[in-house]
């Protein structure tokens, strides 16, 4: 998590440097897109989720509920160990070909590439699938723990605000993940089957993109 935080911060600094001056520093829009995309996923899935929710929350939430442990302790392990391969795939996607940035699909105004790049996009997509599965497992665990593992006197209105914040975050995460999964699947289909979900020249929708 700390390593991901440092990596994400360094990517953030590159973005700030690029945007904080007139003219271009990187001289490559695709590279900039790759950095923006990678920085977002690294920060969310590999810093905030495992450290603040996983590591910190796993210990603090049961403590605040008066519970001996999380509802499914082994599920937490599974959730965590999906993240290292996911991070590896994401970083590999940036190293292969010209990376997966905003120009994943054939949407010319946003990407310098007029054709899809192959393995890079697949690596990024499967990385996000793993991170998504990990998040779902964690969210189910937290929701179940907060609903079922409270001691008798701990009514919902007596829950500490930290526990409420984790509870609401987990619910919102479960609501938003199908949208992410749908978008990722459409990107995968769009690239591999030459459909036009996003490509405006083929009747697709740039807003959806």
Swiss-Prot record:
Gene name as annotated: COI
Binding positions for Ca(2+) per the UniProt entry: 18, 23
Name by which UniProt lists this protein: Cytochrome c oxidase subunit 1
Annotated membrane topology: Multi-pass membrane protein
Assembly and interaction partners: Component of the cytochrome c oxidase (complex IV, CIV), a multisubunit enzyme composed of a catalytic core of 3 subunits and several supernumerary subunits. The complex exists as a monomer or a dimer and forms supercomplexes (SCs) in the inner mitochondrial membrane with ubiquinol-cytochrome c oxidoreductase (cytochrome b-c1 complex, complex III, CIII).
Keyword Metal-binding: yes
Enzyme category, top tier: translocase
Transmembrane annotation, as ranges: 1-21, 34-54, 80-100, 123-143, 161-181
Top-rank taxon: Eukaryota
GO cellular component: mitochondrial inner membrane
Residues the entry annotates as binding Fe(II)-heme a: 39
Originating organism: Octopus vulgaris
Described function: Component of the cytochrome c oxidase, the last enzyme in the mitochondrial electron transport chain which drives oxidative phosphorylation. The respiratory chain contains 3 multisubunit complexes succinate dehydrogenase (complex II, CII), ubiquinol-cytochrome c oxidoreductase (cytochrome b-c1 complex, complex III, CIII) and cytochrome c oxidase (complex IV, CIV), that cooperate to transfer electrons derived from NADH and succinate to molecular oxygen, creating an electrochemical gradient over the inner membrane that drives transmembrane transport and the ATP synthase.
């Amino acid at each position: 998590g700390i390593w991901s935080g440092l990596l994400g911060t360094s990517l953030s600094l590159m973005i700030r440097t690029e945007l904080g001056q007139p003219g271009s520093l990187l001289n490559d829009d695709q590279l900039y897109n790759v950095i923006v995309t990678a920085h977002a996923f690294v920060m969310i899935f590999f810093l905030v989720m495992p450290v603040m929710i996983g590591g910190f929350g796993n210990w603090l939430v049961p403590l605040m509920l008066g519970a001996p442990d999380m509802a499914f302790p082994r599920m937490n392990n599974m959730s965590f160990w999906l993240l290292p391969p996911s991070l590896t795939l994401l970083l590999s996607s940036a190293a292969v070909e010209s990376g997966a940035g905003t120009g994943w699909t054939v949407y010319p105004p946003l990407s310098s590439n007029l054709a899809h790049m192959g393995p890079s996009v697949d690596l990024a997509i499967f990385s996000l699938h793993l991170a998504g599965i990990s998040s779902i497992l964690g969210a189910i665990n937290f929701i179940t723990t907060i609903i079922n593992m409270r001691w008798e006197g701990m009514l919902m209105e007596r829950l500490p605000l930290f526990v409420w914040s984790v509870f609401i975050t987990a619910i919102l995460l479960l609501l938003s993940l199908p949208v992410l999964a749908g978008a990722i699947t459409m990107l995968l289909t769009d690239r591999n089957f030459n459909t036009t979900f996003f490509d405006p020249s083929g009747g697709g929708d740039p807003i959806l993109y």
